[in-house]
């Protein structure tokens, strides 16, 4: 942001008063911390509003840098999600002022550049004033001496080279004249770059100085007033952290499920040699990944793992996409973790063929996945620590935390339901593991292996061994991963954290909903798989309803907003 003297700021406000009729001559000048982007603004009743966590805030003037063809997808040939639908209608209806006005991009058209000097002289009638302005050198016709002042030294990684730049200065016009701001912006162009759309992300510092160098002087500056912009965080930021937190948590649950199954089977999970508990491990993995169970399929193991790898890559991609849109929330260290996860995602996408089928063999997939999964889990654990220790606990972060904890509860329920046969409609306690086999000890062994899978997937096996020091049992194991509020990996602990964050946001209905879910879990006995299935179904439905309420109550713009204090 260029430095703006007091006179420049005052003139900017004065000009905004002229541009904006909707503000009644008193527009607010507000710098939004993150953004705003097109998704942060919405047009209702022919007026523009900022979607913030405190509700919709009216926008009187928009200072835009977007190209003319990317302003309003409803009226110009915009592609993708660029622009704000209905913005030009609001501008024509005088519901918002645009600076710069739509169509002013023609001033930057290179084809018209050679005519602007003559146009300026004709408009002002003072042609002599332009004699002191350098004539524009039109490349490539200009000779080297004319091009030297358009190139600046730049470091390309090996040494200093000449690079062309695009320079942009900022001026504010008023009745008293024109104020030139003390700073500008410059972008370095790579060879072959279009000056209008440079690809390089390298910038240069720009200072605007007068014709003579003034002696250095120290001036005392009055401290700027402290303005808390936390309530003006665009809803997009909260939405990105909410969905990003969910994707990050689901990726961790999925990666750990795959690692646990691979570790306990040593990669030998072919259907013809697998023991019955392995089938339930694959059911658990399919449930967590959200892919078909493929029961009875001879190639089920390879297909399930290939689908799991693909699902993990998609979850990481979703998280990275959301995180990139709110990059200003994350520290530099977190940025390194995001880059490592992006590299891991690229590696995962090479593990399956284009049609989603597995690679050469199940063993090969297991070996490759084992290395990649360990790296992903370490990076996700590091990022989770940074999430809790480095991000400021503002409203946007709280929505991200709600998303993470909700997804953790969903993951626990999916894993338990899948492992114990609830998704295939054959609960573990009702199954005959081997036809005609009455060996109860053998059946107990199979059940214990399934229970160990659930505990290990939720990082609770060590806690179980330390607390009970006995063989794993269904009731105590399920209570530990579902109902134990002191176990941070348990569903109840996650829901309790959701309730806490809802309370900090002042959302009483959310507190009531989560309190009801905790009461259901607390009253459950988990004596059998069937009774557990009833509880898990109720809790899952309640969490899903809560997630939908979050989106509907906070992350969706109302159709008919009204400003407080205005007729």
Write out the residue ranges for each language-model feature.
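Domain-scale recognition of functional cores that engage charged ligands
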Residues: 1-196, 214-218, 259
């Amino acid at each position: 942001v260029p430095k703006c003297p007091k006179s420049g700021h005052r003139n900017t406000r004065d000009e905004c008063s002229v541009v904006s009729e909707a503000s009644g001559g008193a527009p607010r000048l507000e710098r939004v911390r993150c953004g705003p982007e097109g998704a942060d603004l919405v047009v209702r009743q022919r007026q523009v509003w900022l979607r913030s966590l405190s509700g919709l805030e009216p926008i009187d003037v928009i200072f835009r840098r977007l190209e003319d063809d990317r302003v309003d997808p409803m009226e110009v040939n915009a592609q993708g999600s660029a622009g704000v639908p209905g913005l030009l209608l609001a501008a024509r209806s005088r519901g918002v002022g645009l600076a710069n006005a739509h169509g002013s991009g023609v001033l930057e058209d290179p084809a018209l550049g050679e005519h602007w000097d003559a146009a300026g002289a004709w408009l002002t009638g003072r042609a002599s004033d332009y004699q002191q302005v350098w004539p524009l050198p039109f490349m490539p016709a200009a000779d080297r001496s004319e091009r030297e002042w358009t190139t600046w030294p730049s470091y390309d990684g090996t040494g200093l080279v000449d690079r062309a730049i695009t320079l942009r200065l900022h001026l504010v016009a008023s009745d008293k004249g024109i104020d030139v701001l003390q700073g500008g912006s410059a972008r370095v162009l790579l060879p072959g770059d279009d000056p209008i759309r440079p690809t390089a992300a390298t910038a240069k510092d720009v200072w605007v100085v007068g014709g003579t160098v003034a002696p250095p002087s120290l001036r005392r500056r009055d401290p700027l007033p402290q303005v808390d912009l936390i309530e003006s965080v665009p809803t997009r930021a909260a939405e990105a952290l909410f969905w990003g937190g969910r994707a990050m948590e689901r990726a961790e649950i999925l990666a750990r499920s795959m690692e646990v199954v691979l570790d306990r089977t040593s990669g030998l999970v072919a259907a013809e040699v697998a023991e019955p508990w392995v089938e339930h491990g694959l059911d658990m993995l399919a449930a967590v990944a959200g892919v078909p169970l493929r029961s009875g399929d001879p190639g089920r193991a390879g297909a399930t793992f290939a689908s799991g790898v693909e699902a993990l890559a998609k979850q990481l991609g979703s998280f990275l996409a959301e995180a990139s849109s709110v990059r200003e929330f994350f520290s530099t260290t977190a940025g390194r973790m995001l880059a490592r996860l992006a590299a891991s995602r690229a590696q995962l996408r090479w593990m399956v063929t284009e049609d989603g089928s597995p690679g050469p063999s199940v063993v090969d997939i297991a070996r490759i996945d084992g290395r990649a999964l360990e790296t992903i889990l370490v990076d996700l654990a590091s990022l989770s620590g940074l999430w809790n220790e480095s991000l400021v606990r503002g409203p946007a972060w709280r929505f991200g935390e709600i998303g993470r904890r909700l997804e953790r509860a969903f993951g626990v329920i999916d894993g338990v339901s899948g492992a114990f046969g609830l998704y295939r409609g054959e609960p573990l306690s009702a199954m005959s593991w081997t036809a005609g086999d009455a060996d109860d000890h053998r059946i107990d062994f199979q059940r214990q292996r399934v229970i160990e899978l659930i505990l290990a997937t939720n990082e609770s096996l060590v806690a179980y061994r330390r607390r009970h020091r006995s063989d794993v049992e269904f009731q105590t194991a399920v209570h530990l991963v579902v109902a134990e509020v002191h176990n941070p990996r348990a569903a109840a602990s996650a829901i309790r954290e959701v309730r806490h964050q809802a309370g900090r946001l002042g959302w009483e209905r959310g507190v009531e909903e989560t309190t009801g879910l905790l009461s259901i879990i607390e009253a459950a006995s988990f004596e059998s798989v069937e009774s557990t299935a009833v509880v898990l179904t109720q809790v899952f439905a309640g969490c899903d309803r809560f997630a939908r309420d979050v989106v509907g109550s906070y992350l969706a713009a109302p159709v008919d907003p009204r400003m407080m204090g205005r007729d």
